[in-house]
UniProtKB/Swiss-Prot annotation:
Cofactor(s) listed: Mg(2+)
Name assigned to this protein: Digeranylgeranylglyceryl phosphate synthase
Record keywords: Cell membrane, Lipid biosynthesis, Lipid metabolism, Magnesium, Membrane, Phospholipid biosynthesis, Phospholipid metabolism, Transferase, Transmembrane, Transmembrane helix
PANTHER family xref list: CHLOROPHYLL SYNTHASE, CHLOROPHYLL SYNTHASE, CHLOROPLASTIC
Classification via InterPro entries: DGGGP_synth, Prenyltransferase_related, UbiA_prenyltransferase, UbiA_sf
GO CC, any one term: plasma membrane
GO molecular function: geranylgeranylglycerol-phosphate geranylgeranyltransferase activity; magnesium ion binding
Catalytic activity from the UniProt record: sn-3-O-(geranylgeranyl)glycerol 1-phosphate + (2E,6E,10E)-geranylgeranyl diphosphate = 2,3-bis-O-(geranylgeranyl)-sn-glycerol 1-phosphate + diphosphate
Chaperone as UniProt keyword: no
Family as reported in the entry's similarity comment: Belongs to the UbiA prenyltransferase family. DGGGP synthase subfamily.
GO terms under biological process: glycerophospholipid biosynthetic process
Transmembrane segments: 18-38, 44-64, 106-126, 141-161, 163-183, 218-238, 243-263, 269-289
Amino acid sequence: MSAGIRTYLELMRYGNCLMAGFAAVIGTLIAFNILTSGPLSSNFTGPFPFLDAGFVFLVVFLVSGAGNAINDYFDIKIDSINRPERPIPSGRVQAKEALYFSYLLFAAGTLLAFSINSICGLIALFNSLLLILYAKTLKGTPLLGNLSIGYLTGSVFLFGASVFGLEGLKTLFVLFLLAALAITAREIVKDIEDMEGDRLEDADTLPLRIGAKKAGYLAVLIGLLAVLLSPLPCVMSILGLRYLYLVLLADLGFLAAIVQLLVKNNPTKSSKMFKIAMFFALIAFIAGV
């Protein structure tokens, strides 16, 4: 390959990959705490699986980087106008090189995931295929693109928990669902925020298809569903009362985001409030064991 390592790291958006990798390890840590000392503690009594957690980090880093690289491959025309400094439109990486590089990362990440266990491998394989489909088709498909991002982001935590097999998967499934709902709602709000730019680029997003008002109602519905379901981890004895107290802060943030969207018609502020609320939700997940 003609480009240097730094250029390929830029193509991967390595900063985002690092954050995704750490988020997956947090999923492993939360599942470990729940399975060993939480209200639903199981027969698992082993030490924290540091090696598998390291593999989890690498898998998510590689697969996330592959998704970003192949996304740039399919966005060559748009990036040549909006982001000409990116590796492909700037000519520092050839388009075919970026495509082959992404396939290499997908393969390496998936194989490494199967070395952890079959559940991790299947999740990595499915997510890799979904990332390819998203970059090629779903990104420009109203709602399906938003749902894909919601699932993919939330599944990072689920993947980390899958180190412990099916038991780990079941343990964090509700948390994954809550995260996916919140992220999907925010993605729709971001599309409302970006309507003017998307219209100029002739993009096909949900707000442009059905209107900002209807898209806003859908985002609110999904966000409210996340709020209504947020006590479930405590009700199901997955997490303790500390989670319930802390998640109330997140719920207040989500409600504030809804007010900003519906009452004040400020999608930019709403998107920021969603982001803050999700941060408090993550703290609640970690501290609630």
